[in-house]
Amino acid sequence: MDLFARESGPVEAPAVVFLHGGNLSGWSWEPVVERMPQYRCLVPDLPHFGRSFEQGPFEMGRAAAAVAELIRSRVGAGRAHVVGFSLGSQVGVQLLATEPKLVDRAVLSGTVVNTMPFVRSTQLLLGMISRNGIYRRVLSRYLNSRPASRPAPIPSAKIDEYREDVRLITSGQLADVVVASAGFTLPEGLGKSDSPTLFVTGANERSGIRRCAAELARQMPNAVDRVAVGMSHDWPLSDPDLFSRTVDGWLTGSALPPEIALPK
């Protein structure tokens, strides 16, 4: 699978692959990428999103395999750092479990793992809801109506990309993404990955997501969980300065910003 990917930065610099969330495609990472010119940044549109829309349907295993193929084909060293947000962080976890040798260090924010006893029932229910035409219209209106409802400020130069993402994600294929994300459980083999990994959540996120970060960190020998003080789920996009400093600190093994704290 050949994903569309934006690329910037020096070819010889450490490579970082950015995996976007579930409502916006890869262009949404631009404010973060602009703050990290010292890295070679690869920003794919995941299957069924943006310019990789025709690579759908979205399935977690297929998405991780496509990212692995991207790293093998575009990164000469054969390894890359991985940064993920929300849906992209789930893909990052899957990649750590299935292709650990491809990942150097990772920063994964807002990762949701289904720990409920009846995973399939959850998938069926949410899939049914997301296939409902009324739900799609409500979602489309919600994403388009008020600037405050958007997951992050949308630059005027990116309005066309934003509207196209909304159009695609509110199509019938939305159910594929919802089902894959809702059914994501701890993948087999995650404990064998020794990639240093930071699982981070906004301190204002739901407690269940913070518990997911703690559980994921427990599965890996070199992982930790932290919280971004005063931040919500979308903080990687709404505060790109803090997020880019967090990523740079983790990737270089230096101190994290003071806003990144131990969970209480």
Language-model region placement:
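Conserved HGGG/HGGXW glycine-rich cap/lid loop of the alpha/beta-hydrolase fold
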Residues: F4-F53
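Active-site loop/oxyanion-hole signature of alpha/beta-hydrolase fold enzymes
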Residues: L42-V83, R245
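Gly/Ala-rich beta-loop-alpha elbow adjacent to hydrolase catalytic centers
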Residues: G84-G88, G92
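Flexible "cap/lid" loop of the alpha/beta hydrolase fold
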Residues: A97-T98, D104-I134
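Conserved alpha/beta-hydrolase catalytic His-Asp/Glu region
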Residues: P117-V119, R136-K192
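Short beta-strand/loop motif that positions the catalytic acidic residue
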Residues: S193, F199-T201
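Conserved alpha/beta-hydrolase "acid-adjacent" motif
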Residues: R206-C212
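Catalytic histidine-centered segment of alpha/beta-hydrolase-like enzymes
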Residues: M231-P240, S244
